[in-house]
Amino acid sequence: MSINNYLTNLQNELYVNGTEREKIRKSIDTISSRMNMYFGIGKNCEHRIVKKEIFGSYSRDTMLSRRYDEKSDVDYMIVFENANQYNPQTCLNWLKGFAEYWYSTSIVKQSLPTIVIELENIKFELVPAYETLWGTKYIALDTSSWQYTNPKELNDKMLDVNNNTSYVFKRMVRIIKYWNIKKNYRKYISYELETFLTDKFQYSYSNCKSSLDYLDWAFYFLGQYKYIDQYVHQG
């Protein structure tokens, strides 16, 4: 088997598809409908949800199959009305109440700044948020403060690069993420790794003709990581 054939097979293995993707989709739909019910009755009506949004690697289509990354999760942003009038911990408590009510047989825990629900097929991280009148979003930074976020920015940039590289880029990103897990001991934060590679490949891919070329170029860029401290996981 040639190296390029091996890489093609690995890319297919890492991708979340088929039954696994369908189970995740059903879990998302179930959580969404249960939230509508939970926050639509009794005292919980006070905490009205105005928007729910999947973000993170699942929305970018760069999440690895759980067969290759046991820590794969789906990030779910929950935008509450007037959440800016509360500290993030209060909103996290609302989400924890929901999770414990509907998922009493699953592992539910707070892992700042999210509430984690560990289902059999996938882990969800519920992230409280609020949105301004101008559409600017803020998510929990810690228990007492909010931080600006714009998931669409990276999603759009990554989509452009992927289209410009004939859909090779995202497949390459998944391989690099797998390498970071298995050989690099998760040294690099997944989100920052994807951001770094997207920025680098925006204008530097014209000489890449095969999957191996893209990987070779990616590892060349990764050699610069030691000079870019914000991309290195300190924990």
Which stretches of residues belong to each language-model region?
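Extracytoplasmic/secreted envelope proteins and their assembly/folding machinery
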Residues: 25-28, 32, 92, 96, ...
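Catalytic cores of NTP-dependent nucleotidyl/adenyl transfer enzymes across multiple folds
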Residues: 29, 110-234
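A broadly used, surface-exposed interaction patch
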Residues: 65, 74-97
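Histidine-centered divalent-metal-coordination microenvironment in nucleic-acid enzymes
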Residues: 51, 59-62, 69-71, 75-77, ...
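Conserved catalytic core of two-metal-ion nucleotidyltransferases
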Residues: 35, 39-42, 47, 91-139
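Beta-hairpin (beta-strand-turn-beta-strand) motif
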Residues: 57, 81-83, 129-131
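N-terminal regions immediately upstream of nucleotidyltransferase
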Residues: 1-71, 84-87
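Glycine-rich, often proline-containing surface loops adjacent to acidic residues and nearby aromatics
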Residues: 71-79, 151-157
